[in-house]
Amino acid sequence: MLDIKFIRENKDIVKAGAAKKLIEVDIDKLISLDDKRLELLKITESIRAEQNAMSTNIAREKDENARAQMIMEMKGVKEEMQSKEEELKEVMREWQSIMVAVPNVPDITVPEGTSDEENQEVKVWGEKNTFPF
């Protein structure tokens, strides 16, 4: 599987390689999904940091009323975190399904053909084995 950084930097080469292998892959959709994935990762990490800070503050708080208020706020943060994580999981599923479909880029010396029948044997090494069955 190709690295997403390589795909971003060499979008045209990857598109041409997929076309050369007769594989249809939407590279633009992959990159937009990756942007969304990175954004959601950033958001979930910031919410998680906020959640951790609130947990620490709740533990330090002595006043029961203030503590109860903080716990109520924490529930809202937790719900937001869960919704963002669900959204991230969905984006990750789609992102991974496209990433798996992206083929490796063929070598530039590979001859082009429209089907498997047009493949050429470029080099033979060793002898072919014959089996008695």
What are these regions (language model features)?
Residues 129-133:
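Short, intrinsically disordered, charge-balanced linker/junction segments flanking boundaries
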Residues 1-128:
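N-terminal alpha-helical targeting/anchoring segments
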